[in-house]
Structures are given as structure tokens and as C-alpha cells.
Swiss-Prot record:
Keywords: ATP-binding, Glycerol metabolism, Kinase, Nucleotide-binding, Transferase. Belongs to the FGGY kinase family. Pfam families: FGGY_C, FGGY_N. It is an enzyme of class 2 (transferase). This is Glycerol kinase. One of its GO terms (biological process) is glycerol-3-phosphate metabolic process.
Length: 501
């Protein structure tokens, strides 16, 4: 009997295929790095074909390396980088343009102009839970339709399909038979009404986007179709799709209201489970869908930071201050502090709670005594300070946070997590499986395939790897954070756009 689950985690800088057994234990994984393109300042793109090729390669290789066949796989689940936008031809399957990444800021002027119109901003926030920011898919779709010759006319004729990465991969896996997405990914487009759980005609009119572009929206556990026989040699049922941050929340067993997880990958994403309540933040966080099962919605409150692990990659690649990403841990711990240096990594603007798309990165406090170790440490500390920004916002919105569950590639850095616990003043628990997005996807795919009976049964399998407890003097904590706030204040643009009503 087939009992293995294949989870795909398609991320910003890499694609992973991870095998789990029926007890949700990680059996084997394979990953492939993918290319990001930066054709202009603030523009971030991917090659959709490379995303697909890397996904198929990972699936084939992980099966071969684990000495398994596709027939051994009971279910396949997909998690993905959210908001990243792809339009393709329904007849040929060819992408119309590169995938516009979630970090892309090219539509900032359009978003500002739209937000300045009377009543638009309040209506958008009420319907979507989001803000009018280039982060979300709606303005990216609009840009492609307006700037690629013939795109709008083809869309009006029903010849084009839109999808976030999950939808595009599903189309490719099923040989074009299924054009669908899930509720979590739909909720990040800026076109989905999270109150009514449907595409919103008024929002489509606002952005002048033909409804024929859009995929069908399904629950996170659903029958999404089967992989095409020619791809893996056997038809595997696709039983789950979910955005990567929501997948991580499920993988971290954050299924009860009040539970919080934070994922540290390219960016940092903190998600609070708010149960069946939509909480419109008073502190610039996003209302979103955490998951939807059996037509029942669980909502979340999310803070999004654009640059976390990407700051370490910046230290490695253009600056060559480190050779490998994991060098950052030893270098940060080799100095007592940053020597007064603060890095504000606003390379693509600042996300929550500032939402300033025009802010740009800055280093403060440099002296002749500044060493590269100080800058490396400042980059890691910046991730933790930004996390404290989010925690303060969550607390001010009424949550009670005593423990934070963390995952993602950066969570392997012990120094980072200890400093995180210190600066937050709360316990930090690292999951035994730091591939929480893949684990959550496997949980849901297994549920959809009947391998698990309930969400509670699955998440009962969650285990902590290590607990980090605050050790920093509270006065020192406040001094360091005060320095961060002053650095951010100097980085913000004088006339940051009004993104909230």
C-alpha cells in the first residue's frame, strides 16, 4: 500500500521536494537553487519554466535517491512562495512574461495613486484584509496586462490564465487539466474577498482585471487532480495546496487561536492564529486566511518582513564578507556586540509594521574600528529587531505571547535564536523539523488522502528540537531596541505612502 507523502516547497531562492512517511517523519529531501533576476532597481523576477523544471527535477531525484517509485506515493502536496505572479497562455502553456516576485516594487506609484482615491483604501482593506502595496498579486497582474503587447486583449478573450506559483505548478503537473488555487494563496492576491470567500467583482473592476484569468478556489485539502502519467511514471493524487507561511503554521501545530509561529527564510513571516475571527489590525498587520478545511475558515494575523535570510545572502554574494551563509553564526559570536552598528535592510522597502516601499537600506554607526564581524552581526540582529517590531504590534492588537515557535533555514542558527529570545523577552522553540512548510503540506496532503483522520492527530506529532530562554538584562534589551528604532526612523522616507485607512 502506498504510504509515503511527497511535499513540494517552492520558495524564493530554491525548490525542495521532501518525502515523509505515514508518521510524518522526514525520509529524504532534494533541493535545487533557482535564479532571481533584478532587471531594474526594485524589480524582482523569476523564470517560470525554471521554477517548473526545478520542481520536476526535485521530484524525480528525491524518489530515485530514496529508492522509491511514484507508485509508492499516496499523496502529493504543494506549498509555495506567495503573491509571485505568473500569466500564461491557456493553449500553449507558455508564460507571457517572467514571474514577478513578491518582493517586486515596480507598481508602487500605481498603488499610491489608487490609495489616494476617496474610499478605495478602506474598501480594499475591509474586503481583503491586506494593504494597497506592490507586495500583492493584483497590481502585478495589472502591470503585465498594461505593459505586455496584446496581453489585455488576450485576457479579455479568455486566452490567458493567472496563477500564483501553486496554480502554475498544478497546471503543469496535470498537463493543463486543472486551473485552481487554494484559499490561502487566493487571499494574498488582493482580489479575493476573505469575508465572502470568493473573487470580488468590485475589486476586479477596480484593477480592470478580466475574471476569466482567475483559477477556481478550493479548500487546502481537496482533490486537485493527478500528476500526468508521463512526468513521474505513475499518476499521483494531488490532495493539498497551501501558501508557504500558512503551511509552516500548520507544520508548527499552530492550530489553536493565540498560537504564533515565525518563519525565517528569505524574509520573515510571523503568523498568529485568530480562529474564526477576522481581526483588522490597529497596528499595521495583515488579516489573512490561515487555512480552510471543509469550507470552514481559520483566519490569521500576519506580519511580513521582506529581508531576513536575504540579508545574509547580501553579505555573501555582492559584498563577499562571508564565504558561506552559516559563517554568519561564528562571525557574529566572535564579537561582543556590533560596535554600535545598525543595519536597516530596507533593500526592497520596509514591510510590517512600517510599510514604506520607498525606504532603502542603510548602515549606521560605522567608525574606523568597525570590522566585518560587526556588520555581519548587525545583519543578524536586524532580523531579530524586525521580529520585535512584529511582536509589539501583535501584543498591541491584544494577543498574549509567551512562546514563539520558529522554523526556516535561518532557524538553524543557534546564536540568532538566542539573541531573538533575548531581544523579545520570550521563550523561543525551534521545531525538530525546520522544514515546517513542507511538514505542514505533508500533514494536509496526508489528511486529504485519508492517511490522517484529523488536523489534531497530525499536529500532535509536532516536537521541539531546542528551547531558547531570555538571558539578557531588560535594561540592555531596551537600550539596543531603542537604537534600532532610531536607525529605522532615519531610514523612513519623509512622505511614506498612506497604505492604511
Amino acid at each position: 500500500m502506498s504510504s509515503f507523502i511527497l511535499a513540494i516547497d517552492q520558495g524564493t531562492t530554491s525548490t525542495r521536494a521532501i518525502l515523509f512517511n505515514e508518521e510524518a517523519k522526514l525520509v529524504h529531501y532534494h533541493h535545487v537553487e533557482i535564479t532571481q533576476y533584478f532587471p531594474q532597481g526594485g524589480w524582482v523576477e523569476h523564470d517560470p519554466e525554471e521554477i517548473w523544471d526545478s520542481t520536476l527535477l526535485c521530484c524525480r531525484n528525491v524518489l530515485e535517491e530514496a529508492s522509491l517509485r511514484a507508485a509508492d506515493i499516496a499523496a502529493l502536496g504543494i506549498s509555495n512562495q506567495r503573491e509571485t505572479t505568473i500569466l500564461w497562455d491557456r493553449h500553449t502553456g507558455q508564460p507571457l512574461y517572467r514571474a514577478i516576485g513578491w518582493q517586486d516594487r515596480r507598481t508602487v506609484n500605481f498603488c499610491e495613486q489608487l490609495a489616494s482615491q476617496a474610499g478605495v483604501l478602506a474598501k480594499f482593506v475591509e474586503k481583503t484584509g491586506l494593504i494597497l502595496d506592490p507586495y500583492f498579486s493584483c497590481s502585478k497582474i495589472k502591470w503585465i496586462l498594461d505593459n505586455i503587447k496584446g496581453a489585455y486583449e488576450k485576457a479579455k478573450r479568455g486566452e490567458l490564465a493567472f496563477g500564483t506559483v501553486d496554480s502554475y505548478l498544478l497546471w503543469k503537473f496535470t498537463g493543463g487539466k486543472c486551473h485552481a488555487t487554494d484559499a490561502t494563496n487566493a487571499s494574498r492576491t488582493g482580489l479575493f474577498n476573505i469575508n465572502q470567500q470568493r473573487w470580488d467583482d468590485e475589486l476586479l473592476t477596480l484593477f480592470d482585471i478580466p475574471k476569466s484569468l482567475l483559477p477556481t478556489v478550493l479548500d487546502n485539502c481537496a482533490q486537485f487532480g493527478f500528476t500526468d502519467l508521463d512526468l513521474l511514471g505513475h499518476k499521483i493524487p494531488i490532495t493539498a495546496m497551501i501558501g508557504d507561511q500558512q503551511a509552516a503554521a500548520v507544520g508548527q501545530a499552530c492550530i489553536k487561536p493565540g498560537m504564533v509561529k515565525s518563519t525565517y527564510g528569505t524574509g520573515c513571516f510571523m503568523l498568529l492564529n485568530t480562529g474564526d475571527q477576522i481581526i483588522h489590525s490597529r497596528n499595521r498587520l495583515l488579516a489573512t486566511i490561515a487555512y480552510r478545511l471543509n469550507d470552514t475558515v481559520t483566519y490569521g494575523l500576519e506580519g511580513s518582513i521582506f529581508i531576513a535570510g536575504a540579508a545574509v545572502k547580501w553579505l555573501r554574494d555582492p559584498l563577499h564578507l562571508i564565504e558561506k551563509a552559516n559563517d554568519s553564526e561564528s562571525m557574529a559570536s566572535s564579537v561582543e556586540d556590533t560596535g554600535g552598528v545598525y543595519l536597516v535592510p530596507a533593500f526592497t522597502g520596509l514591510g510590517a509594521p512600517y510599510w514604506d516601499p520607498n525606504a532603502r537600506g542603510a548602515l549606521f554607526g560605522l567608525t574606523r574600528n568597525t570590522q566585518r564581524e560587526h556588520i555581519v552581526r548587525a545583519a543578524l540582529e536586524a532580523v531579530c529587531y524586525q521580529s520585535k517590531d512584529l511582536v509589539r504590534a501583535i501584543l498591541n492588537d491584544g494577543a498574549n505571547l509567551t512562546t514563539l515557535r520558529v522554523d526556516g533555514g535561518m532557524a538553524a542558527n543557534n546564536w540568532l535564536l538566542q539573541f531573538l529570545s533575548d531581544i523579545l523577552g520570550v521563550n523561543v522553540d525551534r521545531s525538530r523539523c525546520i522544514e515546517s512548510s513542507a511538514l505542514g503540506t505533508a500533514f494536509l496532503a496526508g489528511l486529504g488522502a485519508g492517511l490522517f483522520d484529523s488536523l489534531e492527530e497530525m499536529t500532535g506529532l509536532w516536537q521541539a528540537d531546542r528551547h531558547f530562554i531570555p538571558q539578557m538584562d531588560p535594561k540592555k534589551r531596551e537600550e539596543l531596541y531603542d537604537g534600532w528604532q532610531k536607525a529605522v526612523e532615519k531610514t523612513l522616507t519623509p512622505a511614506a505612502p498612506l497604505l492604511f485607512p
